[in-house]
Amino acid sequence: MNKYLEYPEVESKETPPQKLVVLLHGIGSDGHDLIGLVPYIKNDLQNCHFISPHGIEDYDMMPYGRQWFSLRDRSPHIIATLIANNISKLEDIIREKQTELNLTNKDTVIIGFSQGTMIGLYLTLVQQAPFFCTIGFAGALIPPMKINNKLTPICLIHGALDQVIDVSEMYNASNYLSKLNIEHSVHKLTSLAHSIDGRGLEIAINFINTCHNMV
């Protein structure tokens, strides 16, 4: 039983599932937000079980919503410390579902949006065993103190008109990943602000299927 909050999930069309897809929402939202993407992608990912956990903390700047970590202080070193302190709680949620489905990291896809991308990328880089792949929409990279995993392929997708997290953050992340020789791709989407659109979902689906073909 999840000791944090019961979250929405969608079972795979095929049984048993071969992949676990973990959807990580942005700040001030909750798991019900990104689970709404599943109807648009599940037909192309029929062997995937989808979960969309709620952020592990109450959103501390509004009386509703959830967060993975506070953004009251946006200093990079403060954010890195907060993520490091909270990351094990997210890992617990994922491990619990992996155990239930008899899956492991190599069968797990991480998809984040905004703050969910921040914690998703951090989570990916600190794993002892690599995830299948990681996809980040409209986010930024907060590097951990220690990199344990350089093997998970990463796809970054960002709107060119994003005024919440500037698209330059995608290129900052790309430069960092390149220095570590981590396989990744970047996609700047024209006429898109801080959001996910059909183009981004198509890129994500193709990326997951490409990674599958490489295994």
Curated annotation (Swiss-Prot):
Its EC number is 3.1.-.-. Keywords: Hydrolase. Pfam families: Abhydrolase_2 (PF02230). The keyword Hydrolase applies. GO terms for molecular function: hydrolase activity. The active site is at residues 114, 162, 194. Coiled coil: none annotated. Belongs to the AB hydrolase superfamily. AB hydrolase 2 family. This is Uncharacterized hydrolase RT0729. It comes from Rickettsia typhi (strain ATCC VR-144 / Wilmington).
